[in-house]
């Protein structure tokens, strides 16, 4: 029994292991190019079965703990390997030995406590290596990177345990585009540890305290282009002039990100600008100034300028003691050489007039996302303020009057570019005043609903996107670029208003079509962006857009952003792919063909009706339907006549002088119905015929050549035919007044023809001796 349980347990383990491997393999998705994605799949190991076809493998954000030398041995063509954000604590020595084509390796944020140079000894083409966020204290006993001659981006260190940097750590590296060192708790920095790197484009240092900052600067100041300091408290920073005063420097840019200053440490940083003379650009991003701006008591007055700094950028500056902050007048003299200033999202509501006047070299000023209003702008743009300013950005402030803002900026004689977007102007006055050299104006997202002559005629670039505009009818003779997306325009602007326009972006309006003629009217247009509109995919529009091979060179967002909105059966399709039927595109031709076909059909029907007496059938059908409304057969008491006599007018002498005399003068007399005598005046003649036939016991047809040719006799014959057909009786009496060919009787009167073929008809004898017998037979036929 125990042996059986043991066997069952072993089989269960094997099955579960197989299922686990199968689940892991299925959780890895690969495309035909060899890019495999296993990101965030809860994997606890590297999936098996990886082959040489894998070129990119993303296994980040899983639960992998171990990398063996067999896991990746078949991935000889692998170029990108992402193993970040796992639980890896062990990597075997030869785990990456077969990855000779690897260019990108990410092992960040794992649990590696020791690093080995053997991991990288075959990675000759590796360009990117990220080792951030692991548990190691140092970069190993030997040089990790000596076998990586092509490495360009290196990220090392962590926020807690990494405490030492030694001289051997970066041996073998000569050029790096980016080096990031996370060393918040750095305690030991051996001098010249970074000096072996001959050139570093961008160095990112995470240092909690600035104790070793100057030592690091001494080593890199001659080989570094950009230094970025992150997450540092500079309260105790002190700059020693002697340390780098005699050295050549190559640093051009300093970035302080999430750094804390005091008044004192800020002065020390300003000193650094003077002694590291190559610095041209300084950026403060998300920094905190724990002071009140009191620099007078410090040595700042002995510093005459900010070195060679030309560009100053400040974003999200936080000043806890903002309401105690002083007027900064002590730093005014330092700003004379600055050409570009950006102070963004820092609650700036005023630039003092005196400071504006000291910024004599300023060419670019960006005060976006602050609290500037017309009242404070009046003080900032005072006389002699910013004398060389060319570009002013006041995006997302508290400006409300377009007219007043333009008037306040008249002091800026050299201003040619103004961005006042994301302010709530709502409307535009009819006239405005602007600096005379204005060439570029940004009024996007200002909620304006119409454009007026307020805009300067000197404009070359105009941005009025994301507003409520429904038309554009301004004449701007010098405008070269127009940005008018996200409005309510229904058509392209008139080209005559914009004679030199070269770039137009008019996407996401309510334009439903445009034509070749419209585009050709913009003679200098090189770039058009008109996607995101609700296009009516008419035949003309599709023919134009699909037939112009050069259209893609003008429409920069063609074809992916151009979709049909109608007709409904192509809605959502790309304009390039939409197809319409022949009837939709050639409606006139189809209608003409249909009309011709209908005409031919009607003509054919007319011929057939004539040939087969269709008109007669329709007339008879109508009359028959009218007659059907009456009683099917007249009751006996409604019979008024013994016989209705149908005859030709030319045979009236025989009927009226012979037949009437013989029948109505006979005893007992017969009552005959004659149309001349008995038809009701004013009544429709067809109704008279129908009523007379129905009120007569018999119908006598006096057949002759004249009868066959008579139109009304035909009607009487027709209705008699219907009566014979409908009532199935023998009410007809045929009298041949003169010999007549049976073929003269129309073929459609089949029953009457049958009567003539199957019954004896009465023939008027020429011989007078036989006429008495004729009348006798006629009287007998009427009585039958």
Curated annotation (Swiss-Prot):
Signal sequence, renumbered to the chain: 1-20
PTM statement from Swiss-Prot or TrEMBL: Ubiquitinated at Lys-754 by PPP1R11, leading to its degradation. Deubiquitinated by USP2.
GO annotation, cellular component aspect: Golgi apparatus; membrane raft; phagocytic vesicle membrane; plasma membrane; receptor complex
LRR repeat intervals: 54-77, 78-101, 102-125, 126-150, 151-175, 176-199, 200-223, 224-250, 251-278, 279-308, 309-337, 338-361, 362-388, 389-414, 415-437, 438-457, 458-478, 479-500, 501-524
Cross-link Glycyl lysine isopeptide (Lys-Gly) (interchain with G-Cter in ubiquitin): residue positions: 754
Main location: membrane
Family that this chain belongs to: Belongs to the Toll-like receptor family.
Name of the protein in its database record: Toll-like receptor 2
Native source organism of the sequence: Bos indicus (Zebu)
Gene name, Swiss-Prot/TrEMBL: TLR2
